[in-house]
Amino acid sequence: MTMNSSIIKNEQAYLDLLRLVLNEGTEKGDRTGTGTLSHFGAQLRFNLADGFPLLTTKKVHLKSITYELLWFLNGSTHVDYLQQNGVRIWNEWATSEQTARFNRPAGDLGPIYGHQWRNYGATTTADGQYNSDGVDQIAQVVEQIKTNPNSRRLIVSGWNPGEADQVALPPCHTLFQFFVADNKLSCQLYQRSADLFLGVPFNIASYAMLTHMVAQVCNLEVGEFIWTGGDCHIYQNHREQVELQLTRSLYTLPTLALNPNVKDIFAFNYEDISVDGYESHPAIKAQVAV
């Protein structure tokens, strides 16, 4: 596969990208000391009418994806909400050793995704906390989709260069843009750093879920989710897992169901979101690089 070949959509495109990076990626060092095979610049397209893009070639933990997205939308940056709901995906970055790097207590991840989405550019208090005087980008973009759907400014940015060194992990999925055409809502994500085996399957499902949620509250149908990656990499200690995944056949994608009574993007609860018909191969364990 080359990156300018004919467009292949949905999960097969993801598998083709894994194969490309595994076979042709450049060996590079990285911040974690693990080492990667890397490829710069890739795009995957998922037609959301074909199903919900939750990978079937390995089981993906939907509960973690759903709670994390609700956590982002709530504007929270502390892991207590996740941990109370049995989600551990941020634990490695929430230790006292990690948070001491930017002078915060254990569990406080700093101004990461939720803060940037809901309170971008907020001023700080004397104790280093944030006032509620920033830009609520989510509320703003939903209102713009409703009132000015032809706008080319339907953008949310998680990347704040002035705060990128004040967080447990600078945002990997940095910016997303919505697009409305023919009464359908599409979303494109730009991900600066893409851990193809562990992280990207979560990111694809999370932003596809968000697209469904925003579409519902804006009375639109869903169109495409488009994932665009910058540094697309496979960690050296994930190579065997990737090779195993590439031996597996595809199942039909499941469908996402939302409680149709929810009309406010901030009113969704975990129980309002479900996936039907998810059939997959078993999970494949791998170590996260911190």
From Swiss-Prot:
Ligand binding ((6R)-5,10-methylene-5,6,7,8-tetrahydrofolate): H61, D195, A289
Catalytic activity: dUMP + (6R)-5,10-methylene-5,6,7,8-tetrahydrofolate = 7,8-dihydrofolate + dTMP
Domain of life, per lineage: Bacteria
Transmembrane segments: none
Pathways involved: Pyrimidine metabolism; dTTP biosynthesis
Keyword Magnesium on entry: no
Pfam families: Thymidylat_synt (PF00303)
Record-level Gene Ontology MF annotations: thymidylate synthase activity
Cellular component terms per the entry's GO annotation: cytosol
Keywords associated with the record: Cytoplasm, Methyltransferase, Nucleotide biosynthesis, Transferase
Entry EC number(s): 2.1.1.45
Residue positions binding dUMP: R31, R152, R153, R192, S193, A194, D195, N203, H233, I234, Y235
Matches recorded under Gene3D superfamilies: Thymidylate synthase/dCMP hydroxymethylase domain (3.30.572.10)
Cytoplasm as UniProt keyword: yes
Localization (cell): Cytoplasm
UniProt record similarity statement: Belongs to the thymidylate synthase family. Bacterial-type ThyA subfamily.
Primary role: Catalyzes the reductive methylation of 2'-deoxyuridine-5'-monophosphate (dUMP) to 2'-deoxythymidine-5'-monophosphate (dTMP) while utilizing 5,10-methylenetetrahydrofolate (mTHF) as the methyl donor and reductant in the reaction, yielding dihydrofolate (DHF) as a by-product. This enzymatic reaction provides an intracellular de novo source of dTMP, an essential precursor for DNA biosynthesis.
Protein name listed in UniProt: Thymidylate synthase
Protein source organism: Psychrobacter cryohalolentis (strain ATCC BAA-1226 / DSM 17306 / VKM B-2378 / K5)
The gene coding this protein: thyA
